[in-house]
Structures are given as C-alpha cells and as structure tokens.
Regions:
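Nucleotide/pyrophosphate-binding catalytic subdomain
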Residues: 1-210, 218-220, 225
Length: 226
C-alpha cells in the first residue's frame, strides 16, 4: 500500500482463482474536503495497481461529500419526499464522480467495460443505477449511502471492495458491527453479503485545511458514510 495510506481487512474469503474484475474503490466524500485529495487518491490507485494482477484495474465510486451532508441536515430539519432526496443525493454523486474523473485524468463510465484502453475508471453512478432496474432495487432513504452503492457495484462485478475513508474503522469487527458504530451505513451489511473481499484504507497524514467548507465528515464518529 502507498506510504500515504494505512489499510486493513474487514473480510476475506477464499474463492479459488483471483478475479480479473476491477477492484471497486469507494472514495469517501469526506476525503473531498482535503485540499490534497487528488494526490492522495492518485497514490492509492497507483499502489493498488502495483499490487494487483496486471489486468486488474480499479473502479472508483465517489461519495457525495459536503453537499450530500447538507441535504441530509436540511432533510432532518425540513423533511422532504424521501424519493426526491434519494435522487438528489445520487445526482450529487454524479457531479463528484465527474470531478474526480477530470482531476485524476480517468475515464467516466456508465459500465466498467466502457473504459476503452484504460484499466482504471470512475463510475458514473446515476448512469449505472439507471440501467437494468438497479435504481428500483435500491432501498430509498438515508440508510443507503455511497457505501452500500459501492458494495452493490462490487457485487454486480464479482469484485472486491476497498472503502477509502477519512478515518479508520472504530474497532475491528464485521460489517454489522461497523454499521452499528456508524462507520458504514445501515444497509451496508445487506449490500455487502455477496462480497468475498472487503478492505479499508485511510490517510496517514493529518488533513490540510478543508476546501471552502467542503467535506462530508460530521466528526470522527460519523465519518464516515458520505
């Protein structure tokens, strides 16, 4: 792993032969509040690519960051139709995914196999969910965040999942324990059931000053799921 990141394992199950599917990396929206996030994420991608098989790249699912946290806070104070807020949060992930693709120099794709000539890409989450009735199969509400969406992507691809967040898990434990502690969303244990490989990573360094108030952390205990 990169010297910029620390990592750990949440789940590993033997599945015989290694999968050629790209490793799904959920880039926590809270990381987007760091002024150095493109360099950090780029270093993480490079480290994963070095350690993986030559034909296995990465597929990034980018969280919504501070904008989604603002939607969540506003909805708690002035409740709106759940379906509308659900769609709004997913639309924000489309914007953060577009930005990540631009700043990292990666293709933005609606399906992993559309990354022509590039093993690593950023997923256009709204476009991906809009295909094959995926959006309709996803529960509506704040119990589902980019954590669960990334798990659904990994399950669909038969891939592993790396959760890149601002802080490490509060304690060792299974997915249900992490959901109970607020490190992943409440639906994540269900979404992640098919996955054989789940790991985490977080930056080793103290974050530089946030960019104009962006960022998804609501303190260490909440961190978590943006």
């Amino acid at each position: 792993m990169s010297a910029s990141w620390q990592q750990g394992t949440i789940r590993t199950r033997s599945r015989g032969t290694a999968t050629p599917a790209p490793l799904v990396i959920k880039v926590g929206g809270s990381l987007l509040g760091r002024i150095d996030w493109p360099q950090l994420v780029g270093a993480l991608i490079s480290a994963v690519e070095r350690e993986a098989a030559a034909d296995r790249g990465c597929l990034l699912v980018v969280g919504g960051g501070g904008v989604v946290e603002s939607l969540r806070s506003s909805d708690a104070r002035w409740p709106q139709p759940p379906e509308r807020m659900h769609q709004a949060a997913i639309d924000v992930m489309g914007a953060t995914g577009w930005l990540a693709a631009r700043l990292l120099g990666l293709p933005l794709v609606a399906e992993p196999d559309q990354a022509t000539g590039r093993a690593t890409s950023v997923l256009d989450v709204p476009a991906w969910l809009g295909r094959e009735h995926r959006f309709e199969r996803l529960p509506v509400g704040w119990d589902v965040t980019s954590d669960s969406i990334a798990a659904c992507v990994a399950a669909s691809e038969g891939s592993g999942l790396l959760l890149a967040k601002s802080v490490p898990p509060p304690e060792a434990g299974d997915c249900q324990t992490l959901a109970d502690r607020g490190w992943v969303d409440h639906y994540f244990p269900q979404a992640a059931k098919p996955l054989d490989e789940i790991a985490w990573a977080c930056p080793r360094s103290v974050p530089p000053p946030a960019v104009g108030g962006a960022g998804g952390d609501r303190g260490r205990a909440a961190a978590l799921i943006g």
